[in-house]
A protein has these predicted regions:
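Conserved catalytic motifs of ABC-family nucleotide-binding domains
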Residues: 47
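Catalytic Walker B motif of ABC-type/P-loop ATPase nucleotide-binding domains
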Residues: 51-54
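Short loop immediately C-terminal to the Walker-B catalytic DE motif
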Residues: 57-58
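H-loop/switch region of ABC-family ATPase nucleotide-binding domains
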Residues: 86-87
Length: 113
């Protein structure tokens, strides 16, 4: 059963991803990076214990990427488990506890950070 999400939680999630004040815009007016951040906001609204992100910084500019990294670090401090998939190890190296490298669907390297 999903939690009831109120306006307070929605506005807080939008603020966490840098979309504060944009809640009344139609989604079609959002840039690709804004849509990426909206998806991240939707993921964190229900306060799940596990978050899975696939290429989360792909459509974000440098400031948006840093904002996402800050958000991930905050979520980690709150005890959340986070799984990040990325083609760019440098993007996740500084925020990961453990990295698995895969090739052709197989784990070829595993290391703790």
């Amino acid at each position: 059963i999903r939690n009831q999400i109120g306006e307070k939680e929605i506005l807080a999630a939008l603020e966490q991803v840098g979309l504060s004040g944009k809640e009344n815009l139609k989604v079609k007016k959002y840039s690709l990076g804004m849509r990426q951040r909206l998806g991240i906001a939707q993921a964190i609204m229900e306060d799940p214990d596990l978050l899975i992100f696939d290429e989360p910084t792909n459509s974000l500019d440098k400031a948006g990427s840093q904002s996402f990294i800050d958000l991930i670090l905050d979520l980690k401090e709150k005890g959340k488990t986070i799984l990040l998939a990325s083609h760019h190890i440098a993007d996740i190296d500084g925020i990961s506890d453990e990295i698995f490298e895969m090739e052709a669907g197989q784990i070829i390297n595993r290391r703790k950070v």
